[in-house]
């Protein structure tokens, strides 16, 4: 399944610099090349953007039909 702009994706690896963890969900806002990397926006459930990160294709996957949301509190920097 290919990932397109505006798709929800799940991190498969931590991004410590951005304070993000595997399992966090974001929205693709730009595709680099032929999908070698994605610009992904991560937000709180309240709608506040917490990070926009360039993520390699190997570090994200599409949201699946059987995925369930899970809440974690964002740690302060």
State where each predicted segment sits.
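Basic/aromatic-rich interaction segments and small domains that mediate binding to polyanionic partners
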Residues: 3-66, 71
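Extended, low-polarity transmembrane helix blocks
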Residues: 75-76
